[in-house]
Regions:
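Conserved amphipathic alpha-helix within the SDR
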Residues: 1-8
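Conserved mid-core segment of classical short-chain dehydrogenase/reductases
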Residues: 19-33, 76
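Alpha-helical segment proximal to the catalytic Tyr-Lys
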Residues: 52, 96-97
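Residue(s) in the substrate-gating loop at a strand-loop-helix junction
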Residues: 67
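C-terminal helical subdomain
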Residues: 107, 123-160
Length: 184
């Protein structure tokens, strides 16, 4: 309400909050609820806040940051991956429900990026993308009409492979990560 009052319009809203606990920290239901509270329900609450304003003004754009592991699954990310899959399903449902109102929904698919939430993953930092490059690439695509937005052509191809071969890609990513860190 304060944002709408101050700026008169809300043209875009981006949900980029993320909680990705370490494997051993996400074995109970409470951990799963906490992850869903941030990753899924945070996006739902954002949508519930901005949607009435966007409908009144005749349009707007809502973006949710998703993850390839929400498509493929990933060993050890049993709280995070399903929360991102649910987030993608929410974006699809909202896109269908708001199609006639001029409000569009989009999902951002960044690659594995060097952030605090990915620091514990058993992946060498060299294999993680630079957050500045990813952020700039995604920002350039925020005006695109595509539902799935990636920061680069390579990431778009990799994301398409995840959609085409989800379980196969999940196995591959899990195996590659295990090879990078045999102790994991």
């Amino acid at each position: 309400e304060a944002t709408a009052a101050q700026f008169a319009r809300i043209d875009a809203a981006i949900h980029n909050a993320c909680l990705c606990p370490k494997v051993q920290e996400a074995r109970d239901s409470a951990s799963h609820r906490e992850v869903f509270d941030v990753n899924y329900f945070g996006a739902l609450h954002l949508t519930q806040c901005v949607l009435p304003h966007m409908r009144r003004q005749g349009g707007g754009r809502v973006f949710f940051t998703c993850s390839g592991v929400g498509i493929t699954g990933f060993a050890g990310l049993t709280a995070y991956a399903p929360s991102k899959a649910a987030l993608e399903a929410l974006a699809k449902c909202c896109a269908l429900e708001c199609a006639g109102a001029g409000v569009t929904f989009h999902i951002l698919h960044p690659p594995l990026t060097r952030t605090r939430s990915s620091a514990f993953l058993p992946v060498p930092p060299a294999f993680m993308a630079d957050p500045e490059i990813v952020g700039r690439g995604l920002a350039k695509r925020l005006t695109s009409r595509r539902f799935v937005l990636c920061h680069s052509l390579l990431q778009r191809v990799q994301t398409q492979a995840c959609y085409l071969f989800p379980l196969r890609m999940g196995r591959l990513l899990t195996r590659m990560t295990a090879r990078c860190n045999p102790r994991a």
